[in-house]
């Protein structure tokens, strides 16, 4: 049994070996067949590739030859075009060169002609100079004047003629400007005055208190004059008791103190009890009453003019102007009138109405305290307005109304004009005889101070001065320059309300006697 198994195993092993050998040889034969086939296929592929490559090579060579041919043709065409363009450019250059040659020849001909003409002109100029010199010598010989003297004579004549023409032009321009400005000013001022009607009460330095009887005079004087002394001491006013029937005169330059004394005295007369203690009580009441009157007057002025927002102290100062006068004109009423006029004129001219009215109302505010503070009323007024925070425009507009400062705004000019209109209105002011006479004398003195003035007369209460000149000194045109110069001197040297008319008269008379 075991031997049989071994034998079977050996047989199986031998069978496997034989199978392996048979398989090896079989695969070898198959592989060799495949290799042979592959070699044949490879040869065929190579042959086909060589044929395709040859064909492609031939096609590429053909295409390259065609491209080269095409490029050659293109280059030849471009070369032909360039040659043609160069030929055309060459022809144009040749034509330009020929044209330049022709122009050059023409210019040379013209240059020759110009040179000839210049030579001819030089010769003619020399000839003219010679002729001119000969003529000058002949003229000098005939006239007896040198050329320099003749030139001065001609210049003098030209200067006179020019001055004459300038005077005519100035006369014409001034006449037209004056006519237009006066027409417009008259329209504005007339319209303004028509809309303004202010009352003016002329005040003096005395007040009169009526008495019920002359017996009251003794009671006012009191025992040994103690009553009158007390009243004068408390008020600072002089009481004049004379032979005037049933009247006592209060004299003093401070109108507010005079008003306090008047009210106190009237109250004492009504009360009947007149002694120092009662006098002191009544004076104190009168002061309070006057303070209230002042306050109400200031408030009424601001209400009437429509000026609002003033500092209370400025309102009080305005009220004090109720008791101030200037040349007999009540200053508060004058200020209200100036405010009205300035506002109306500002409205007509398109200026700032509120500014003009405010500055017009405050323009004389310094007069309320000018007897207490040193300085002009303009300077005092400026300081007061600065103190109470008024605007720079208002301060400037009020500061120019007496010419102390140059006006820089139309409102300032309008305030000045309104002040002059109010002051110059007939009956508004009066002045002392002495100052009036001095002003007239000064007017005539200014006029007589000019050469060629024969006589001068101040007329129309100093509103006009007539000047008679010597006709041999001034001609008809030069008198306008004289009038202008005199006007400027009057404006510079004199102070006067309103305006002064300067009338220059030139009269020529021819007198002969028949024998």
From Swiss-Prot:
GO molecular function (one): RNA binding
SMART domains, alphabetized: HDc, KH
Limits of the HD domain: 331-424
Residue ranges of the TM segments: 6-26
Enzyme Commission (EC) number: 3.1.-.-
Keywords tagged on the record: Cell membrane, Endonuclease, Hydrolase, Membrane, Nuclease, RNA-binding, Transmembrane, Transmembrane helix
This protein's GO CC annotations: plasma membrane
Pfam families linked: HD (PF01966), KH_1 (PF00013), RNase_Y_N (PF12072)
Protein's membrane topology: Single-pass membrane protein
Gene3D superfamilies the record matches: Hypothetical protein af1432, K Homology domain, type 1
Domain KH per the UniProt entry, residue ranges: 205-290
Compartments in which it is found: Cell membrane
GO BP, one annotated term: mRNA catabolic process
PANTHER family attached to this UniProt entry: RIBONUCLEASE Y
HAMAP family reported for this sequence: RNase_Y
Function: Endoribonuclease that initiates mRNA decay.
Protein family per UniProt: Belongs to the RNase Y family.
Name of the protein this chain belongs to: Ribonuclease Y
Species for this entry: Alkaliphilus oremlandii (strain OhILAs)
Gene behind the chain: rny
């Amino acid at each position: 049994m075991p031997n049989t198994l071994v034998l079977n195993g050996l047989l199986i092993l031998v069978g496997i070996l034989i199978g392996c050998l048979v398989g090896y040889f079989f695969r070898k034969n198959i592989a060799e067949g495949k290799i042979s086939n592959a070699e044949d296929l490879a040869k065929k592929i190579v042959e086909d590739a060589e044929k395709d490559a040859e064909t492609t090579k031939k096609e590429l060579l053909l295409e390259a030859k065609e491209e080269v041919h095409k490029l050659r043709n293109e280059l030849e065409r471009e070369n032909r075009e360039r040659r043609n363009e160069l030929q055309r450019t060459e022809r144009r250059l040749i034509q330009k060169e020929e044209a330049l040659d022709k122009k050059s020849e023409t210019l040379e001909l013209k240059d020759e002609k110009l040179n000839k003409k210049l030579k001819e002109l030089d010769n003619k100029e020399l000839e003219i100079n010679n002729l001119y010199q000969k003529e000058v010598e002949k003229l000098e010989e005939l006239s007896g004047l040198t050329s320099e003297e003749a030139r001065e004579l001609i210049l003098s004549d030209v200067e006179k003629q020019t001055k004459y023409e300038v005077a005519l032009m100035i006369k014409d321009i001034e006449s037209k400007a004056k006519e237009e400005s006066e027409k417009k000013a008259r329209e504005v001022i007339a319209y303004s005055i028509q809309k303004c009607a202010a009352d003016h009460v002329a005040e003096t330095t005395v007040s009169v208190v009526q008495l019920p009887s002359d017996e009251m005079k003794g009671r006012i004087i009191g025992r040994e004059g103690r009553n009158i002394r007390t009243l004068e001491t408390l008020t600072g006013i002089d009481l004049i008791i004379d032979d005037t029937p049933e009247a006592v005169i209060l004299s003093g330059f401070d109108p507010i103190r005079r008003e306090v004394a008047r009210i106190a005295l009237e109250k004492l007369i009504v009360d009947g009890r007149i002694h120092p203690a009662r006098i002191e009580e009544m004076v104190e009441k009168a002061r309070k009453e006057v303070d209230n009157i002042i306050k109400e007057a200031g408030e009424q002025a601001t209400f009437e003019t429509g000026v609002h927002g003033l500092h209370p102290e400025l309102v009080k100062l305005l009220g004090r102007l109720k008791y101030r006068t200037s040349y007999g004109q009540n200053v508060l009423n004058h200020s209200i009138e100036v405010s009205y006029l300035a506002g109306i004129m500002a409205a007509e001219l398109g200026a700032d109405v509120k500014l003009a009215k405010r500055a017009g109302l405050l323009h004389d505010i310094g007069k309320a305290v000018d007897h207490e503070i040193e300085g002009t009323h303009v300077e005092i007024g400026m300081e007061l307005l600065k103190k109470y925070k008024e605007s720079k425009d208002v301060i400037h507009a009020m500061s120019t109304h007496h010419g102390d400062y140059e006006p820089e705004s139309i409102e300032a000019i309008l305030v000045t004009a309104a002040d002059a209109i109010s002051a110059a209105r007939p009956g508004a002011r009066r002045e002392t005889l002495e100052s009036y006479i001095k002003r007239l004398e000064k007017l005539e003195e200014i006029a007589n101070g000019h050469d060629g003035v024969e006589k001068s007369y101040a007329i129309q209460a100093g509103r006009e001065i007539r000047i008679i000149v010597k006709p041999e000194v001034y001609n008809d045109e030069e008198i306008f320059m004289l009038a202008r110069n005199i006007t400027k001197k009057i404006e510079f040297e004199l102070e006067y309300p309103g305006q002064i008319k300067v009338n220059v008269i030139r009269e020529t008379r021819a007198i002969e006697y028949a024998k």
